Amino acid sequence: MKMYFNNENGERYEILTRVHNEVMLLQTMNGNYIVARWIMGDSWGAGHYWMNDRSGAWKDFFKLAYEASGENMDYNEFIEMFREV
């Protein structure tokens, strides 16, 4: 069953995976990926988050996100899509 996340602007994203209920990989309706991170209370901060420390939950998250995406690219290429520019 597909799950979706709607932001305050009414934009709809498909939830591809979640890790520890703290971070989600979302896919926009036009195919772009967004990482959303739980901020506080009941709000999600969506954006292209990049963590230089790829250990712990973030390492697990990107591994699961890569597997869930089904992208035909190598893992390092995949995580580069999330580097902040």
List the predicted regions and their residue ranges:
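A generic structural signal for ordered secondary structure
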Residues: 12, 29-36, 60, 78, ...
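Negatively charged, low-complexity tracts enriched in Asp/Glu with abundant Ser/Thr
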Residues: 1-18
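Mixed-charge, Lys/Arg-enriched low-complexity segments
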Residues: 43-85
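Short aromatic-glycine-(Arg/Gly/Cys) micro-motifs in beta-strand/loop hairpins
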Residues: 20-48, 64
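Intrinsically disordered, low-complexity regions of eukaryotic proteins
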Residues: 13-16, 24, 55, 76
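Detector for Asparagine
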Residues: 6-9, 21, 30-32, 52, ...
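Compositionally biased, intrinsically disordered low-complexity segments
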Residues: 18, 26, 82-85
